[in-house]
């Protein structure tokens, strides 16, 4: 039997009791890969778009009620969680990506009809309480790698020790279509700050 913490809180509140829940701050959930403009070699552009989250913690983290609220939108559901030091993939069309991903990687689709902007935009991840967990403002120029802009590679965060809000911390994946749900191909090639 699984007991949901929020159900217990609701029950306590119903009977006039109260308690305070202090949830850990998960600064270690990061946007780690963006495939915003796939190559036509893969097929239809929007079928292969994805975002990847990476959990730097040594324990699984529930994404229940976390959200993506700019770029694309998605509110995560109760079953959505990221394994310890693992990945979570958010896709435009999961059917396409499932052919590339390791079979055990958790995933979901973002809201229907949306796609990532091919020239750049802000991608925002928010915790369940609305606080900012991570944000990346990517572009296809101004210091950002240009190969991920329709040439096949994804945009990969180069190292978990680098600030992922900086263009210099991102590079082009070495593989067509990137590495959804797996370690980034560029990891270990740059010195963390």
Walk through the language-model features, giving the residues of each.
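Alpha-helical segments with a strong preference for the paired helices of cellulosomal dockerin domains
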Residues: 1-19
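Activation on beta-sandwich/Ig-like modules and their edge loops
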Residues: 20-167, 172-179, 191
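Disulfide-bonded cysteine-rich modules in secreted/extracellular proteins
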Residues: 1, 189-193
């Amino acid at each position: 039997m699984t007991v949901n913490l929020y159900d217990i809180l609701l029950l306590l509140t119903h009977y006039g009791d109260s308690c305070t829940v202090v949830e850990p701050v998960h600064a270690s959930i990061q946007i780690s890969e963006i495939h915003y403009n796939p190559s036509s070699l893969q097929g239809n552009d929007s079928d292969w778009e994805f975002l990847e989250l990476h959990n730097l913690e040594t324990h699984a983290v529930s994404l229940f009620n976390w959200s993506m609220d700019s770029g694309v939108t998605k509110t995560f559901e109760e079953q959505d969680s990221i394994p310890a030091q693992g990945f979570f993939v958010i896709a435009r069309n999961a059917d396409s990506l499932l052919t590339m991903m390791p079979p055990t990687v958790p995933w979901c689709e973002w809201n229907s009809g949306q796609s990532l902007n091919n020239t750049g935009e802000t991608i925002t991840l928010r915790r369940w309480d609305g606080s900012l967990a991570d944000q990346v403002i990517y572009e296809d120029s101004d210091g950002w790698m240009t190969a991920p802009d329709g040439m096949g590679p994804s945009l990969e965060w180069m190292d978990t020790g680098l600030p992922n809000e900086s263009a210099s911390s991102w590079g082009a994946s070495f593989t067509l279509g990137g590495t959804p749900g797996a370690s980034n191909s560029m990891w270990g090639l740059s010195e963390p700050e």
